[in-house]
Amino acid sequence: MRTMVLLFFMLLAVYESAQQQTLEDKVQNLVDLTSRQSIVKFNMDKWKTLVRMQPRNYSMIVMFTALSPGVQCPICKPAYDEFMIVANSHRYTSSEGDRRKVFFGIVDYEDAPQIFQQMNLNTAPILYHFGPKLGAKKRPEQMDFQRQGFDADAIGRFVADQTEVHVRVIRPPNYTAPVVIALFVALLLGMLYMKRNSLDFLFNRTVWGFVCLAITFIFMSGQMWNHIRGPPFMITNPNTKEPSFIHGSTQFQLIAETYIVGLLYALIAIGFICVNEAADQSNSKDRKNAGKKLNPLSLLNIPTNTLAIAGLVCICVFFSFLLSVFRSKYRGYPYSFLFA
């Protein structure tokens, strides 16, 4: 009897030793793979061994994507770029202990369609967190791109919430903006040099008014956010395949969305200009001097009442559209006017 008990404990010790050795081998394999590049590109064998098979004392952040041009996934490449920023930041800024707790990987549909079938996935991109104790049949935690966005900061917050490992996101320098600014300044200086004998346009109030309005609309629409984050022009709903020009999250936006918001602000401004011009025309008692006003609205010779009504319609309609855009991005937004 004692021999049987002793043999049982010996076998148990050998099993635990082999299991521990297997775990150490898996972690070391991942460390070796991520020492050459920040992410692990999974095939079926690596997927079964490193992600789905126990034992595992580390977390895997895996993006399922389709980067092949034939798949026609417009947001896969931007989402992959943001994912790589987080993975590279984790590789170069996290401590050695944190780098052994969290690993980043990618499954491309072209390279491993069997993994997509195993996970019952027919859309991309999708980001999953496979925790240390997640079983082979349990569903991993998924990041909600529609609500949270897929920029690097949002992915970093998802990683921190799931793993308690905080990744300091560091973006690579973007030299596009400085080059564009330098070219614009050079063009402006060249124009000033060519017109050095006639600089009257610098004192034209209409020109400066248009310049100020253009700058205001650009910044109010969120165009600078686009230059910093580089979002896609639009996205396609993976379920309905319908294009979406406004992202349904306050943490992300699309390029088309900034154009829409900027246009709405411009139309609202035109409405206020019409109302203001109508008030000036109605209050002006000197018709001779009023006829000398050199602005487009006075030159069109539009009746005062028509101008005022057109301005009010522009303000009411397009301001209502603007509020509806805000409500579509934030469901708890309390204000609306003509449209829900």
Swiss-Prot record:
Keywords attached to this entry: Disulfide bond, Endoplasmic reticulum, Membrane, Signal, Transmembrane, Transmembrane helix
Main localization category: endoplasmic reticulum
Disulfide bond residue pairs: C73-C76
Pfam families: OST3_OST6
Compartment annotation: Endoplasmic reticulum membrane
Record has Disulfide bond as a keyword: yes
InterPro entries linked to this entry: OligosaccharylTrfase_OST3/OST6 (IPR021149), Thioredoxin-like_sf (IPR036249)
Domain Thioredoxin: 33-164
Entries under Gene3D superfamilies matching the protein: Glutaredoxin (3.40.30.10)
Transmembrane portions of the chain: 174-194, 206-226, 255-275, 306-326
GO cellular component, one term: oligosaccharyltransferase complex
Cleaved signal peptide residues: 1-20
Record keyword Endoplasmic reticulum present: yes
Gene Ontology biological process terms from the UniProt entry: protein N-linked glycosylation; protein N-linked glycosylation via asparagine
Membrane topology: Multi-pass membrane protein
Protein purpose: Subunit of the oligosaccharyl transferase (OST) complex that catalyzes the initial transfer of a defined glycan (Glc(3)Man(9)GlcNAc(2) in eukaryotes) from the lipid carrier dolichol-pyrophosphate to an asparagine residue within an Asn-X-Ser/Thr consensus motif in nascent polypeptide chains, the first step in protein N-glycosylation. N-glycosylation occurs cotranslationally and the complex associates with the Sec61 complex at the channel-forming translocon complex that mediates protein translocation across the endoplasmic reticulum (ER). All subunits are required for a maximal enzyme activity.
Subunit description: Component of the oligosaccharyltransferase (OST) complex.
Family stated for the protein in its record: Belongs to the OST3/OST6 family.
Protein name: Probable dolichyl-diphosphooligosaccharide--protein glycosyltransferase subunit 3
Lineage of origin: Eukaryota, Metazoa, Ecdysozoa, Nematoda, Chromadorea
